[in-house]
Structure formats: structure tokens, C-alpha cells
């Protein structure tokens, strides 16, 4: 790939409002099973789908999950990204903050690019025959700096979610 021109593509992920997404990079065919087991161990009520793009061998999108809709959604997004060794996790009835340590602890996981409920787009770089994730566009830009009222509202929200006493 040395000396090959690079092109960039923005891939907007398909995601209902009530679904969170985690996008990362891993390696090895065992990734799908290990991510599934890590997620399943967090909570019996967590619904999820996982898709992983192989970068060599059969070069298939490997998939798993406990929710058919979320698994299909993860596969469609992985196919759209089409970057070697990338993975997509779609979550419902739980938040990324509840699973991030488990996801990052999976031995095959190299990087987590994003974990969000926001609209998200993946910046994909293509060079020669390969594709890779160059970056993430997560949500919208800020419109100001929080006031004391905003700080109080943030603290209330975290307590409503049960993350703070």
C-alpha cells in the first residue's frame, strides 16, 4: 500500500434513537464470541448485537448477539464501514458506560473509537485494497459553555440515572 493514494468516505451509521453504539478495532476470529460473552455477563436485561469485519482469510462479517434486530443492525453498519478488523456493537436496555470496561478487557480489542447514543458517522480511509477507520464524528458541535444552572441539571440527571449518590 506504500505510495497509494488515500480516499476518505463518511459512513453515517444506521441507529434508532433508543440504541447505543460502540465502534472499535480488534483482531482475530475469536473476537465475536469474546465480545458476546463479555456483554452477556454484564446484565441479563442487556440486549445487543455484535458484528466484526475480518481483514484476511474468508473476510466475512462475523456476527453474534441476543437480539436479532440489533444483530442485523450491527451487520448492516459493519458492512457499510467495511474496514478490516473493525467491530460494531449495538446496545439496547443498557448504556456503553455499563459495558466499556468489559469490552476493553477483551484480549482481541485494540481500540474503541466511540461509544454513543448520538447520531454518529465513521470517517473511513481507503488505500489500495484496504480500508480503515480514520476517525469518528459523534453528535453535534457545542453551542456554548454550561452555566451554574446547567451544572446543577447535569448533577440531577446523573443521580436520576443512579450513577451518583
Give a label for each model feature.
Residues 1-63, 148-165:
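N-terminal, charge-rich interaction modules
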Residues 19-22, 46-51, 60, 85-88, ...:
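Structural motif
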Residues 27-30, 56-57, 66-68, 92-97, ...:
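Gly/Ser/Thr-rich loops at beta-strand to alpha-helix junctions
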Residues 30-34, 84, 98:
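Short, well-structured alpha-helical interface segments that form or flank functional binding sites
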Residues 35, 49, 53, 62-66, ...:
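General "foldedness" signal
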Residues 35-38, 74, 99-102:
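Hydrophobic side chains in well-ordered alpha-helices
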Residues 50-88:
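Aromatic-anchored, charged helix-turn/loop surface patch used as a conserved interaction hotspot
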Residues 77-83, 94-165:
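Helix-rich interaction surfaces within compact, conserved domain-sized segments
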Amino acid at each position: 500500500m506504500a505510495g497509494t493514494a488515500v480516499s476518505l468516505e463518511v459512513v453515517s451509521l444506521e441507529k434508532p434513537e433508543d440504541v447505543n453504539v460502540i465502534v472499535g478495532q480488534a483482531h482475530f476470529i475469536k473476537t465475536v464470541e469474546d465480545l458476546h460473552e463479555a456483554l452477556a455477563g454484564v446484565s441479563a436485561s442487556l440486549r445487543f448485537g455484535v458484528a466484526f469485519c475480518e481483514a484476511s482469510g474468508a473476510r466475512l462479517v462475523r456476527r453474534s448477539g441476543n437480539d436479532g434486530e440489533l444483530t442485523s443492525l450491527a451487520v448492516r453498519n459493519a458492512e457499510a464501514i467495511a474496514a478490516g478488523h473493525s467491530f460494531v456493537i449495538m446496545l439496547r436496555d443498557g448504556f456503553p458506560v455499563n459495558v466499556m470496561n468489559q469490552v476493553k478487557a477483551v484480549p482481541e480489542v485494540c481500540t474503541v473509537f466511540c461509544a454513543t447514543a448520538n447520531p454518529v458517522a465513521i470517517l473511513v480511509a481507503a488505500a489500495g485494497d484496504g480500508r480503515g477507520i480514520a476517525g469518528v464524528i459523534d453528535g453535534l458541535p457545542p453551542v456554548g459553555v454550561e452555566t451554574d444552572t446547567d451544572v446543577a441539571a447535569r448533577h440531577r440527571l446523573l443521580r436520576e440515572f443512579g450513577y451518583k449518590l
